């Protein structure tokens, strides 16, 4: 049986509106589990998630890294 890995998590908050943003940026927000202002989402800290956060520095901020 596989042992469960306790991975690190990162919490992001949406601080910008997706209105008048390209469809790719809207899709990235949805991929992060965000869709409305000031909502927070806790995700596994992976390179893919970090890349999505890096693409949207004007729309999201990292609240907590655990």
From Swiss-Prot:
GO terms for cellular component: cytosolic large ribosomal subunit. CDD domains: Ribosomal_L30. GO terms for biological process: translation. Keywords: Ribonucleoprotein, Ribosomal protein. It comes from the Bacteria. GO terms for molecular function: structural constituent of ribosome. InterPro entries: Ribo_uL30_ferredoxin-like_sf, Ribosomal_uL30_bac-type, Ribosomal_uL30_ferredoxin-like. Pfam families: Ribosomal_L30 (PF00327). Belongs to the universal ribosomal protein uL30 family. Part of the 50S ribosomal subunit. This is Large ribosomal subunit protein uL30.
